[in-house]
């Protein structure tokens, strides 16, 4: 890794859940992406070689170690890296893995949370270097049934009407239960994955696929703008990357009504 071109480690659990808008922002900062596709058996590298770690979502549970033995190694990497101060950005499963790695319980909740739904920031978010940019209420894509208990030392940053835990920070590590990064082209890809399509139709009804895609289409500009603004704040203030020459400051997102 060179000072001119910092590298971030991306832990990806399935091909159809890439960093999307987060990766767009990474590339805009001139960073290199080292992607590991864990579900394809790719080995974990030495985390010390990277300026930060981004862990994405997936259909598995953070507790599925017996079915997916590589999860234990991934959680150990996360625990070691985060305890050493390496910046971390976890999304959906990535947030649950962060909680589990640091001693929080991950478990199946009372009901699934699916669709474009309101998220509310906590009072603590106002003093956070990343979440201070978030409006008090914003819409985000939800698709999960598992949730987590905060690990020791964590600060809660967001909640929703369905689940108390939606975002948290532990030092330089952030976990976001929701998806802000998904553009409509990626939602359309999810609809082409049979297991994802079946899950949506089960949870949202026969027209679930169409409704989800249209929700993402309607809110894409707001959600991806917020994704990139929060991620840029993390890159600058937590990872410590230098803002690229000529890059405009992130636009402060406005509050939007829930879907």
Feature annotation, model-predicted:
Residues 1-84, 201-259:
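N-terminal beta1-alpha1 cap of cysteine-dependent amidohydrolase-like domains
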Residues 7, 85-87, 155, 172:
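Short active-site oxyanion
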Residues 19-21, 45, 64-66, 98-101, ...:
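Short glycine-/acidic-enriched loop or helix-start segments at secondary-structure transitions
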Residues 25-28, 69-73, 106-107, 158-159, ...:
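Glycine-rich, phosphate-binding/catalytic loops in enzymes
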Residues 55-125:
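Cysteine-nucleophile active-site neighborhood
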Residues 102-186:
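Pocket-forming structural segment of enzyme catalytic cores
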Residues 180-216:
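C-terminal helical/coil "lid" or tail adjacent to the Rossmann-like core of SAM-dependent
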